[in-house]
Amino acid sequence: MKQTTIAAIATAIVPQQGSIGIVRLSGVEAVSIAKQLFQTPGKQQWESHRVLYGYIQQPLTQQIIDEGLLLLMLAPRSYTREDVVEFHCHGGMIAVQQVLEACLQAGAELAQPGEFTLRAFLNGRLDLTQAEGVADLVGARSPQAAQAALAGVQGKLASPIRELRQRCLDTLAEVEARVDFEDDLPPLDEAGVQAELQDIHATLQAILATADQGELLRNGLTVAIIGRPNVGKSSLLNAWCRCDRAIVTDLPGTTRDVVESQLVVGGIPIQVLDTAGIRETEDQVEQIGVTRSHQAAQSADLVLLTIDASVGWTSDDQQLYQAFQDLPLILIVNKVDLVPQEQVVYPEAIAQVVSTIAAQNQGISELETAILETVQTQSLKAANLDWAINQRQAAALQKAQAALEHVQGAIADQLPLDFWTIDLRGAIQALGEITGEDITESVLDRIFSRFCIGK
């Protein structure tokens, strides 16, 4: 890594006035740059892990920019294991931008996305699973997602991966010893090797089982509410969100565009799309809304087909069902205060049916239960989720599994020991990719490019 000193704003920049903003420096010149910018009244000592009070100034003109605090963390006792300085100034957009510009004028370089965490990884402060956990924690959209990400930051995924990799290394050492010193050692216990590989493979499979949960926690679900006009789609959205998110009237075609809202159900972030009522219409604007409704439903992870119990199942409902029946679908029978669900006839192939009285906020908890059952995540509880692997980690685990299967095949086919070692090394390399012990620069670039600038 180049011996440069980097700088970035570490707090969110929003148009509203914030109370505090943080600008972070890391690198060999962090302290010297900070001393160009920070004036401390009195005789405050520049010591590691101490907070100093003073004024931040332009390095060239000595014009005062802001009044604030400075936090000094000297290597190796810092996030990056380099000298780190943080300016804690007033929030908002102007003050932090001026402090950052002053850092750059004094010799710092603007940090790339994730560069602070990349340096922490390269300097041995974090392994790769912990670094990815940092990104997931920053981007978490639910408490469960945050807790699963925190488990990654704490190394709860890296620990079993390292243990499995070490077991593969131990097995490889046993096999290679027989290749190099066959006459000096007892015969290899092939049954024992097979049993060990099977156990490692099973453990990898158990870790892989968290991949779908991890994907749900990170990316969530998109749920589209569809149906004919005036069946209560917007009322359902408002009841679900507990606010007047969508306009509700008795006039068909009130909703002309897709209305979005964000919710969390059982720890899963959900984007809810309230769509325009789907019907044949000569109104050009409404027709655009109908087209967008179709597009939203086709791209959704789950469709809530909503019907009016007082009207019953119509030919239009049947057409909508046929259009979206290949997608995960829940039937919402709304307005059951007018006609009980038992009197409504609908296709028997629909497995999930929920009764609601959206105008009275009834049936929402049953709807959320049905959603969790549909995506098979009833057990998705933060307390039971030690970690949640991402797609990159899952791909590496699958590579390791395939390599172990090849070794087992070589044993079964009585192939020479040299064949065993090739795939054992493949499994070891794949597991090393997860923790970063065996990783390419291009993969690192791809991982850290999704970080925010100041992390």
From Swiss-Prot:
(6S)-5-formyl-5,6,7,8-tetrahydrofolate binds at residues 24, 86, 125, 455. One of its GO terms (molecular function) is metal ion binding. Binds 1 potassium ion per subunit. Its main location: cytoplasm. InterPro entries: G_TrmE (IPR031168), GTP-bd (IPR006073), GTP-bd_TrmE_N (IPR018948), GTPase_MnmE (IPR004520), MnmE_dom2 (IPR027368), MnmE_helical (IPR025867), P-loop_NTPase (IPR027417), Small_GTP-bd (IPR005225). PROSITE patterns: G_TRME. It is found in: Cytoplasm. One of its GO terms (biological process) is tRNA methylation. GTP binds at residues 230-235, 249-255, 274-277. Exhibits a very high intrinsic GTPase hydrolysis rate. Involved in the addition of a carboxymethylaminomethyl (cmnm) group at the wobble position (U34) of certain tRNAs, forming tRNA-cmnm(5)s(2)U34. This is tRNA modification GTPase MnmE. It comes from Acaryochloris marina (strain MBIC 11017). The gene is mnmE.
